[in-house]
Amino acid sequence: MKVGLYTVSFSGVWYDGPALPLTEVFALAKDMGYDGVEIGAKRPHANPMDLDMRARQTMREQVAARGLEVPAVAGYSNFASPILEQRENELLVAKEQVKLARDLGAPMLRVFAAWRGITLHNGHGCYDMTRRYWASGFSDVTLLEQWRWAVECLRELADFAGEHGITLALQNHEPVIRDHVDMLDMVREVNSPALQACLDCPLLAQQDDAWVVQSVRDTGKQQVHSHYGGEFEEEGGKAVQRPIRFAKRGLINYPAFVQALAQEGYQGYLCYEFCHPCLGENHELLGLDEVKRQVSLAQRYMRQLLDAAARPVKLPAKEKEKAAR
């Protein structure tokens, strides 16, 4: 397995400070020991409409010059709107992101079935408002209708991606997708070799060993990409996970997740993303230096888990049935 850095971490949204140019992000990724960079296909970094072919070739050369790879381009698709024109617009953007992935030499595009988006409040990112907007925006639309719209769009997009040699990696990210079972069901219903799974541990419905391991087993060879997040500290010369401030969840069970991935034979990327408000002890918004510290610790933390995974431990016994909701 390899460890990547997702460029959204330095997009200027989640901390008090400016976005870093991609050239600086590439340099940081190399200096901090990452193997590759996942490039977010939106401003300020890589919106396809801002990049002509020359700019794309330059970006590809800059990554290669650092000895890095581009394992994926990250899209932000929402195929669950009841408004036909909005779904068509989302397809148009996603198809341009497919072409961007091709031009950057990335093998895949990360996609969502649906996405609430973010807003900038006083210049900084938050999820609060879009969660409320999503809940109240289409009160007469059913989840099943949204599911069918997403499947329809993903089928069209998968056909397009396949023609360009790109694999779509469907993330187990809400809304519409509620858990890894939904993700796998949608991949099965789309029924295209160009649509596979991006299973992320923080998004699993439960974090106990048995659930995490079974989720990885359920996904199996359909797993082509993954992300990890969180915050870290240094203790006793090692990077250790700590709870995210102001978040209503505990630690993520990355140890069981990585062990299970290793035993399933996964050889792809785990890409770190810092995509939540960077807060200090008094809930003040911290700056770029703290994000850099977290990015460095995150790489060390995942390397520790990969080293441990090279010495397999006994995982929970396989279940006869797939994990159920």
Residue ranges with predicted function:
Residues 38, 72-74, 110, 169, ...:
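Conserved beta-strand positions in the central sheet of alpha/beta enzyme cores
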Residues 45-47, 77-81, 116-118, 174-177, ...:
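Short, small-residue-enriched loops and turns at beta-alpha junctions
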Residues 1-35, 64, 105, 155, ...:
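Histidine-acidic metal/acid-base catalytic patches
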Residues 32-43, 71-77:
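Short, conserved active-site loops that position catalytic residues or coordinate cofactors/metal ions
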Residues 41, 170-173, 201:
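Short glycine-centered, acidic/aromatic-flanked micro-motifs in structured strand/loop junctions
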Residues 38-60, 114-120:
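Glycine-rich, proline-tolerant flexible connector loops at the mouths of alpha/beta enzymes
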Residues 23-27, 61-69, 81-196, 316:
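Active-site acidic/histidine proton-transfer and metal-coordination neighborhood
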Residues 47-51, 78-92, 248:
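Short coil/turn segments at secondary-structure boundaries
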